[in-house]
Amino acid sequence: MSAETATNPPVDTTPGAAPESATNGSNANVAADTTAGEASQTTSSTTPTAQPHSASLYVGELDPSVTEAMLFELFSSIGQVASIRVCRDAVTRRSLGYAYVNYNNTADGERALEDLNYTLIKGRPCRIMWSQRDPALRKTGQGNVFIKNLDTAIDNKALHDTFAAFGNILSCKVAQDEFGNSKGYGFVHYETAEAAQNAIKHVNGMLLNDKKVFVGHHIAKKDRQSKFEEMKANFTNVYVKNIDQDTTEEEFRDLFEKFGEITSATLARDAESGKSRGFGFVNFTSHDNAAAAVEALNDKDFKGQKLYVGRAQKKHEREEELRKQYEAARIEKASKYQGVNLYIKNLSDDIDDEKLRELFSSYGTITSAKVMRDFAPESTSDSEKEAKKDSKEPETKEEEPKDEAGDNAENKDNKENKAESKKSEKKPLGKSKGFGFVCFSSPDEASKAVTEMNQRMVHGKPLYVALAQRKDVRRSQLEASIQARNTIRQQQAAAAAGMPQPFMQPAVFYGPGQQNFIPNQRGGMPFQQPGMVIPGMPGGRHGQFGGFPGQQGGRGMNPNQQIPPNAYGIGAQGLPMGMQGAGIPNGLNYPQMGQVQAPFGRGRGQAPSGQGMPPNVQGMGPGGQYGRGMPVQQGMGRPGQAGRGQGAPAQAVGQRDENASPNGLTLQVLNAAPPAQQKQMLGEAIYPKIQAQQPELAGKITGMLLEMDNAELLALVDDDAALKAKVDEALTVYDEYVKNKGGDSGEPAADANKSKDASQETAEETKS
């Protein structure tokens, strides 16, 4: 939706009035200000008699926290509600302050409009009118009335009650500022032009709360703008400043009367003291006389002061000109430093402005180099003050005869010494913020510095060097990148619907005959389905390796042939390449994941069990020799060596490396796995512990912690106190990100990495 550019009241109002009137200055249906996205939907321009089939109401002036449920509770008391929608921002999902309520029949809509208009919802009166989607009907100016000079006590309901006697009102609105205070003007939109004319005739010039109000037809913004330009070209009112305070009214008038007939001349005075404030206004009868006075008296000395004489301007006009001047200066400054100003972060604390300049001086001429620092606190302790007093010794003056030349030379030396002492007495610097800026004289030098210095190690820290950007530009780019990532993640989530999510449920293998076995496959490898757990089977924890959990082998099956619960080489469909129909005997029973059993149970013809397979079964693919795709692991007997009656004692699976973690995960096992699977193994090891602390955000926090080094993560598996500290730190970062971006902590767990990236980017942007 496009933003609704509302019209301003007549020219004597401030720019803040602009958004409060009808759409594009010609909306016939809205007398209210609207936010972006409300353009095509804010106003109501028809009655049920015009469109009897329409039962859609617009509800405006809503508190941002109002939800569909609150509105349903209110509007369902009138009749059956078909639907309710609170309009929200597409990116932030924050309420735009208005909603639509659709009834099943028009009669209920009429009653709701009559009974619920200006009802308090969360302390704010709502404004209800008929919704009109046709822009042609909305943009007619017929029946729209503008009222100004309203008392601040008059609200929407009071204005509606005042003007309801002259006809059917479609919309009524008193303009308010961001704090909810009246701006002193409002709009009333009648159903017919006759009702609007009748209201203007009877109310214009009358007193409302002891204030004389102006009531007139609403003029479109484009029409007012053209009229305003005409008024500027034919001005008669002159503004004069830098007037001497002793100047009287007669002297001020005599100064301008020689240029033509004057209707009024006045000096602004203080209300309490009555003294002149140094400026005044002169109004001529003709534009030519006013222009002649401006031409002759501007920059002329009057009582020792140079006068400023120019066309009198409205407040909003002056503010608009100042805004344009500021914007022009900002653009000029930005273009001046475009491509030459560098942003450097990750600076060491001992790098100051001089060292920063030295680092980059070899790449070109530096116009400025600055390390950003905190403000240094002033020393206020009594001991420091006394030390300062003691250090200041009283100066003694020696009375010795000196010639003039000697005096001049000594004075010069004293001045130089004082200047040097001032330079040497530097103000204490605050702590470095870790980033700074370097400005070069040309873009080529800056580009060379970025190429050479980015990621260079300085004092043990890699520098980040890039072209500096304005804060608003960085924020918009950050929001765009976050929105793009959200879109991609939503698309990926939709495409991967039904696939198991990481760290959300234990990796469980199922016994034969269960529905998750591939049909028509003899002894088929099981594939996992998300969230499915066999009833009665003891649940296990991720990462309990120690060889691998004890699984009771079936008849004729080598125990080492059995697959551990976490077989990372298994493909998306549950089977590695070459394993379909591999002839694995139909002997996979339910895994005992809760505890590590001692020796494997063996059936007839089972070979003695050797050293357990590592948790990460690598190399499952066509290149394997065992089982047509299954590689032969160390300590694993070949198929032909397993005979009947072989009953050598099995090695206890519970035995593991002394340096292994309680989960059986060692640094050697971790390094033996591919890099992509190392994070998966670590994640499955720490996820249950994080889930015990933060059940709702366990996925997010796990993803954030997986950004750490593998060795640090492995240490966290055994150190619950350190893990809890890291979890609290990650939770603090995530909460800060949610506060800054208005996010929702209830997002899917798959977005954990996105939360980490966004929080880091937000922290970096906040620093700069």
Curated annotation (Swiss-Prot):
Biased composition (Low complexity): 39-52
Bias kind Basic and acidic residues: ranges: 753-768
Compartments (UniProt record): Cytoplasm; Nucleus
Keywords: Cytoplasm, mRNA processing, mRNA transport, Nucleus, Repeat, RNA-binding, Translation regulation, Transport
Source organism, top-level taxon: Eukaryota
Gene Ontology MF annotations: RNA binding
Domain PABC residues, every copy: 662-739
Comp. bias (Gly residues): 637-646
Annotated Polar residues bias: 1-11
Positions of the RRM domain: 55-133, 143-220, 236-314, 340-470
GO biological process: mRNA processing; mRNA transport; regulation of translation
Assigned GO CC terms: cytoplasm; nucleus
SMART domains: PolyA, RRM, RRM_1
Region Disordered: start-end pairs: 1-52, 374-428, 633-662, 739-768
InterPro entries linked: Nucleotide-bd_a/b_plait_sf, PABP-dom, PABP_1234, PABP_HYD_C, PABP_RRM1, RBD_domain_sf, RRM2_I_PABPs, RRM_dom
Family stated for the protein in its record: Belongs to the polyadenylate-binding protein type-1 family.
NCBIfam families: PABP-1234
Function of the molecule: Binds the poly(A) tail of mRNA. Appears to be an important mediator of the multiple roles of the poly(A) tail in mRNA biogenesis, stability and translation. In the nucleus, involved in both mRNA cleavage and polyadenylation. Is also required for efficient mRNA export to the cytoplasm. Acts in concert with a poly(A)-specific nuclease (PAN) to affect poly(A) tail shortening, which may occur concomitantly with either nucleocytoplasmic mRNA transport or translational initiation.
Record-given protein name: Polyadenylate-binding protein, cytoplasmic and nuclear
Native organism taxonomy: Eukaryota, Fungi, Dikarya, Ascomycota, Pezizomycotina
Gene coding for it: PAB1
